A protein has these predicted regions:
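Glycine-rich phosphate/pyrophosphate-binding beta-alpha loops
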Residues: 125-130, 212-216, 323
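Short, charged, amphipathic alpha-helical segments
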Residues: 244-251, 277-282, 311
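Glycine-rich beta->alpha junctions and the first turn(s) of the following alpha-helix
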Residues: 169-258
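Glycine-rich flavin
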Residues: 3-6, 12-123
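Amphipathic alpha-helices that form helix-helix packing interfaces
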Residues: 217, 224-227, 231, 253, ...
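A short core secondary-structure module
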Residues: 123-165
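Glycine-rich phosphate/cofactor-binding loops in nucleotide/flavin-utilizing enzymes
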Residues: 304-343
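C-terminal helix-coil-helix/basic helical segment that borders enzyme active sites and/or dimer interfaces
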Residues: 236, 240, 258-289, 299-308
Length: 343
């Protein structure tokens, strides 16, 4: 599937137009890229979620200055984005146990090596796309510094048995987004490359954070699109024969899906006007809550058949729960919104 998507050009969503890609900036490209992910999610949510991480990770290299920056930045940037142009997939393994999704709270460390690379050590999980992605973005604190930075792992020939410092300690066993291969790993001096802005990459998060939340939300709106269509296929011809409870459950769920779709549209417009602010946080939280409630309502309307493994509703109900945990997770989103209200 990933090879087919690369051949179709989807990896170019993480490459700017000046280097032969499709990305023109959030205002021009966020909506069309998100719509691709939304359509894909209606067929395979796990595939779409992993694919959504490709352009969002590469925003760390597409955003900001091109010709300025530290010595070697442009060469580093062109090299990373050139790999995406060649069809390589990028993913992320930045999450860690006990930090609540806050990248700045990382416990991982990195020490410089003689050849200019770094050796990273620490525990990481939620490595979505493990085995499918060629490169993985991560976060660690450089030796002798206080603030974390972005690092890139070349995962193409990296064994998982500990022989090269990387050991899988827990395979992904999620009941939702079951096929994302979001394994947990222990890093012991694994070779990584530091981001070329040398400490400046995390300063880009306020700019790119809304785009990340929007792309993730697109996947879950795609699930809602598919769920609404499937419910109509099953229930449409016998709508008047449904019980009052089934009818009201269906109508309420449809209203909730409509609201989620409007929230998504509002997020897109905010990005297109460069005034995203907390709008995307509100939209992502709204979609997360509405999606869970809507899938529950559709299950009530469809009945016990929705629990069958031959029905997609049971899997969709688990899949949509993931949005609240994706960056920024609910706790951080609430904290940022509260900070804005209190200021």
């Amino acid at each position: 599937d990933f090879e087919a998507l690369a051949r179709a050009g989807l990896t170019l969503t993480g490459v700017p137009t000046d280097l032969g890609g499709l990305w023109q900036g959030p205002a021009q490209s966020a909506r069309p890229v998100a719509m691709l992910l939304r359509k894909l999610a209606g067929v395979d949510p796990s595939l779409a979620l992993v694919a959504s991480m490709h352009p969002t990770v590469l925003l760390m290299w597409m955003t900001g200055t091109v010709d300025g920056g530290p010595v070697g930045w442009k060469k580093h940037r062109d090299g990373v984005l050139g790999m995406a142009r060649e069809g390589h997939w990028f993913g992320t393994i930045a999450s860690e146990p006990g930090i609540g999704g806050d990248l700045l709270a990382t416990k991982a460390t990195a020490r410089p090596k003689d050849d200019g690379t770094w050796g990273m050590s620490g525990d990481k999980f939620m490595g979505s796309g493990s085995g499918m992605t060629s490169f993985m973005m991560t976060v660690a604190v450089p030796e002798g510094e206080q603030r974390p930075d972005i690092f890139l792992i070349d995962a193409r020939d990296l064994a998982w048995d500990g022989s090269q410092g990387l050991k899988m300690v827990r395979p992904w066993d999620g009941v939702g987004m079951a096929a994302t291969q979001s394994h947990a790993f222990r890093f012991d001096d694994v070779r990584v490359v530091r981001h070329g802005l040398l400490g400046g990459a995390l300063d880009l998060l306020p700019q790119i954070g809304p785009v990340i939340g929007f792309m993730f939300s697109a996947v879950f709106v795609g699930i809602l699109d598919a769920a609404a269509a499937e419910a109509k296929r099953i229930l449409g011809k016998r709508a008047l024969q449904l019980s009052a409870f089934e009818q009201s459950s269906w109508i309420k769920a449809q209203n909730q899906i409509w609201l989620a779709q409007q929230a998504f549209e509002g997020m897109a417009r905010s990005l297109e006007t460069d005034a995203a602010g907390t709008d995307v946080l509100h939209g992502k939280l709204a979609i997360a809550d509405l999606a869970e409630t809507a899938l529950n309502g559709l299950s009530h309307a469809v009945g016990g058949a929705s629990l069958s493994q031959s029905s997609p509703f049971g899997q969709w109900m688990q899949d949509v729960r993931a949005l609240g945990y994706l960056r920024p997770p609910r706790a951080l989103s609430y904290a940022r919104i509260l900070g804005g209200l209190a200021s």
